[in-house]
Amino acid sequence: MSVLTRKTFIEGASAFALTFGRRMFAAPSGWIPPKKPNLVFGVLADTHLRISRDGGYDGRNWPDKYLVSALEYFRSQNVDAVVHCGNMADRGVIDEMRFHADAMRRVFKDDRSTDGRKVVKLFINGNHDVEGGGYGAGFRLEQIWPDPDERKKHLLSSDMAGNWLRIWGEPHEAVWHREVKGYHFFGCDWGRDETAFAEMIDANRGTCRLDEGTKPFFFITHDITHDAFNKFIGGCPNAFGLFGHWHQSAANWNTIHMLNETTPSIQCPALYPLFGDGKWLGGGDKYISKAPLEGKLQGGQWRQGLVVRLYDDLLVIERREFGEGGSLGLDWVMPLGKRDPHPFSNDELKKVIGEPQFRKGAKLEVVEEASASPCLRVRIPLADGNPDSRVYAYEVVVIGETGSKKLFKAVYAAGCNMGIGHEPNKGVTTLEIPKAELPPGESLTVAVRPLTSLGTSGRPIITDFKV
């Protein structure tokens, strides 16, 4: 098979080739696809709703309004199902999962959409759900219920089957299989044997025709799956994974993983509030520039989720921010049946992520700050000149006198983890460089180029500055 270029990737699927006269990799705001999808489902992970010190609901930092906002968006998109990749509860407390169920019932009354369709719950437990009683930031459960026997009564894990039935109104299964509109889903709780999970999928391969045609089936876990399971799933050509736990922002394209270079598995972003790129960088950001990324707080405090749409020949993933709202960028589009090379492999993604660009006439603002901690302050305008490629970070190069060593810096783009149009300070990014780090010379040249999360780059803007 010939190499899939950016042009053929965009134009290869008839449903998305040309719309309103514009060539597309994904749908811009307000764009309506020419065909109704076969299946639509929302995806959440790591909600981490939590109790307060008095055992009630702690809505100060983890308000359920963002969960409700996500679910309401799913409802507006006519989802057929909602996936949760685990960690609905923060400390494994029964009421924490009940908070989640209450929000679901407010939005999907009787588990139905506004048109009366059944909305299927595809939920698994994460580590906080099954063993969260031992976790706790700020306070521990021992401070609320000092007596171990009393404390146990409040934990999901004390009777997961009974608690799940009482909360969700359906039996709990640690490993399960569901069918939604002809598409198959398999789920596995945290801590369960992945061998048993593989055996369940394998037992359904023939009866469910999982390997026939190009229709994908989905396996849902809390953490990314491990070697033995990955070896098995690599033999299932239509498999597609969804997992949480890592708390990475979906603005980062490194959250698309390939298991054994054959099976796509998407890390689903957390819905509870995070700054920067979350806790688990996975090494992806370390290699997109010649310097480590700084300024993660500028990326914004985000709460995210996904919407997946299935067509006959395409799988499309929409990435949303639910704190302030908005899209995180162009959809991820996977033509079905293309495997050599796989369209979600890193090399192929680099061909379609594009190159972010500054607008024509964009200028840097460089100011020397003479304070107790003297520095060079560089203000970078938002690189939104290419609507088909969103900026994730900037690489800054400072050049001094001839023969001196160049200084390399890198910084997250302001609001890179927020919805488009919700970047703080109009997307202007500030980088402060300590004066002691600057190369020698009375005149410095400062060059800044925009980067994507995969390291592709646009044209730099350059300015000279006299120290």
Positions of PLM-derived features:
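Beta-strand-rich modules
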Residues: 438-454
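Conserved aromatic anchor
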Residues: 376-388
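Extended active-site neighborhood of metal-dependent phosphoesterases/phosphodiesterases
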Residues: 33, 93-206, 210, 234, ...
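Extracellular fibronectin type III
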Residues: 455-467
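N-terminal export signals
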Residues: 2-3, 7-28
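Binuclear metal-dependent phosphoesterase catalytic core
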Residues: 253-357
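Solvent-exposed loop/turn segments flanking beta-strands in beta-repeat/beta-sandwich domains
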Residues: 385-401, 405-407
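N-terminal active-site segment of His-dependent metallophosphoesterases
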Residues: 27-97
